[in-house]
Amino acid sequence: MKFSPLVDELIQSLRALPGVGPKSAQRMAFQLLERERKVGLKLADSLQKAMSEVGHCQSCRTFTEQDLCPICSSHRRINTGIICVVETPADVLAIEAGGHFNGRYFVLLGHLSPLDGVGPEELGLALLERHLTSNEVSELILATNPTVEGDATAHFIADMARRHNVVISRIAHGVPVGGELEYVDSTTLALSFNGRIPL
């Protein structure tokens, strides 16, 4: 059933979000229109501001309203000499939430995927190489996803970084804390056994 053109447009716009199907989009639209008009207006205002004012950090490519994000503006972070390479800004948030990393990041905004037209240029690897030649970087931690594309991307970046006398490491992959072995896939188990450490 079709509603008014504006309601249909709102539902279709909400469907553009990842994981939102037609029923979920319809429920969200009706909730905003029936009960949450103030929330809807605030959402529209926040979305408009974010779309017009949020860009990418000129150093690491994560989201920011400034030329440099707060992490890249921190002398404490710069002085560590460590850059962690991740695929998305969401990866930065996940690592920051853990509170165990105090260096800087470089966000690829994807991974190598020649079939999709994503090569080194699209990932900003020229900018990453400029960081490596600046003598400010002593270690590069590769934290790409444990997928075929993520591994290929990590190997490509490692080959590039070796030319600059930088220590290169890859984050460990394995069984999650609190996970039960019977539910872990065979590839993850293999990585866990291969990456085991002495006690």
From Swiss-Prot:
A zinc finger (C4-type) spans 57-72. Gene3D superfamilies: 3.40.1360.10, 6.10.250.240, RecR Domain 1. SMART domains: TOPRIM. GO terms for biological process: DNA recombination; DNA repair. InterPro entries: DNA_Rcmb_RecR, Rcmb_RecR, Rcmb_RecR_Znf, TOPRIM_dom, TOPRIM_RecR. GO terms for molecular function: DNA binding; zinc ion binding. Residues 81-176 form the Toprim domain. Keywords: DNA damage, DNA recombination, DNA repair, Metal-binding, Zinc, Zinc-finger. It comes from the Bacteria. May play a role in DNA repair. It seems to be involved in an RecBC-independent recombinational process of DNA repair. It may act with RecF and RecO. Belongs to the RecR family. This is Recombination protein RecR. It comes from Shewanella frigidimarina (strain NCIMB 400). The lineage of its organism: Bacteria, Pseudomonadati, Pseudomonadota, Gammaproteobacteria, Alteromonadales.
